[in-house]
UniProtKB/Swiss-Prot annotation:
Coiled coil location: none
Origin superkingdom: Bacteria
Name used for this protein in its record: UPF0758 protein pc1765
This protein's record includes keyword Nucleotide-binding: no
UniProt keyword Oxidoreductase, yes or no: no
Molecular function (Gene Ontology), one example: metallopeptidase activity
Binding residues for Zn(2+): H178, H180, D191
Family stated for the protein in its record: Belongs to the UPF0758 family.
GO terms (BP aspect): proteolysis
Length: 231
């Protein structure tokens, strides 16, 4: 059987990521080696480890790689559509596992707790994403989800969508969050108006709006901390 010179099988056995994982465990492998196992083989012009190294060089690390779009992945030499799909699926599976662990009895008592929950998903996004965090009567996280994607001035966030989800999840209270792709978290007039509309809806339905966070680059603004949740 002919072995593809750019597959993992072409490497000396002791250097193959798969065998190293078996002998030493997954924690002993570098990100490049983990990616090589996921990809399985390289291209006609590059080994699988070279393709994996190109991915890490292009995106700089796991966080940026997880946020990469299919189009961005396809720009890396050696990554075709099938491999891009493999990567997106594998990385999303890891993200879901991490998110599930976080959701297990996560208490939100301060704006920083809400920020830590969603910052990795929002602070590097080039689209404006509006999310809602739902809490139980004791302030523990029930779940959080995306309500809309796009500029708040272009994609209207209607209170009906926010509170429909709150009721569906049997939330006792909620926190809303969105990012500013510019990196500047200071609230705009549109942000202030939207918050007032949501506050009115929360009072009518008896589901308190605890906070509105705006996520910027390595920073955030909390409406509650800044006394912007006007009564």
């Amino acid at each position: 059987m002919r072995i593809n010179e750019h597959s993992i099988q072409s490497l000396p056995k002791e250097e193959r990521p798969r065998e190293r994982l078996i002998r030493h465990g997954a924690d002993s492998l570098s990100l490049i080696e983990i990616l090589a196992i996921i990809l399985g083989s390289g291209s006609k012009v590059a080994s699988v480890l070279e393709v994996s190294r190109a991915l890490v060089t292009r995106f700089g690390g796991l966080e940026a790689l997880m946020q990469a779009t299919l189009t961005e992945l396809l720009e890396v030499q050696g990554i075709g559509f099938a491999k891009a799909i493999q990567l997106k699926a594998a990385l999303n599976l890891g993200f879901r596992a991490t998110r599930q662990q976080i959701k297990s009895r996560y208490l939100i008592e301060h704006s920083s707790h809400a920020y830590q929950l969603v910052k990795d998903e929002l602070e590097n996004e080039n689209r404006e994403i509006f999310m809602a965090i739902f809490q139980d009567t004791k302030g523990y996280l029930i779940t959080y989800e995306v309500i809309s994607i796009g500029s708040l001035s272009q994609t209207l966030v209607h209170p009906r969508e926010v509170f429909y989800s709150a009721i569906r999840h049997k939330a006792a209270s909620l926190i809303v969050v969105h990012n500013h792709p510019s990196g500047d978290p200071m609230p705009s007039n549109q942000d202030l108006k939207l918050t007032q509309i949501l506050l009115e809806g929360s009072r009518l339905l008896g589901i308190p709006l605890r906070d509105h966070l705006i996520i910027g680059k390595n920073s955030y603004v909390s409406f509650k901390d800044q006394n912007l949740l006007l009564k």
